Amino acid sequence: AHGQILHQKADNPYIKEKRKDVITSRAMHVSSKELGLYGILDVVEFHKDEKGVPLKGKRGKWLPTIVEYKRGKPKSDTRDIVQLVAQTICLEEILGCAIEYGYLYYYSVNQKKRIEITSDLRKEVANLACQMHEYYDKKLIPKAEYFKNCQLCSLVDICMPRLSKKTRNVDNYIFQALKSEDSL
């Protein structure tokens, strides 16, 4: 619930702000044909800058910066960074520009962390996207680990970490699900 409250403003695409030379856009839909991914960005800040891109209905050029909101604190692994980099690649593809950095904002510790979008991170995201598509093509459900934070995640009902502790075949999964319904 707390994460939902945190995202209420960030997830509302109708709330747009302009303060001085910064336009803030929320809940922007993005996709990448290159990665085969799509998603919704929490916040994109467009800063007036000659190195930026033109925006329809706005004078000058605007440099986009993504701000991804997280309820908790920085993780010991790269999952938040990978998400931000994937979002960046999607936005770059749509706008036809290069984005050098983005931000992760961690609510519980009130920390806005600048993340450089490096070529190594871009390669990692491309590799992970490729692996994801391979799982899909092979009709496999990847294993997921259950952590106490899983219940706070907006994707817990899709990921189902308690049920997917090992890689499984989709056809077998559906068969087992239907089989258990037949016994009711």
Go through each PLM region and give its residues.
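Short alpha-helical "patches" and their helix-cap loops
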Residues: 1, 99-108, 166-177
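Metal-dependent nuclease catalytic cores that hydrolyze phosphodiester bonds in DNA/RNA
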Residues: 1-66, 178-184
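Generic detector of well-ordered alpha-helical segments enriched in charged/polar residues
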Residues: 4-7, 122, 126-129, 133, ...
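Surface-exposed loop/turn and secondary-structure junction residues enriched for glycine/proline
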Residues: 33, 40, 85, 102, ...
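Nucleic-acid nuclease catalytic cores
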Residues: 38-39, 45-138, 151, 157
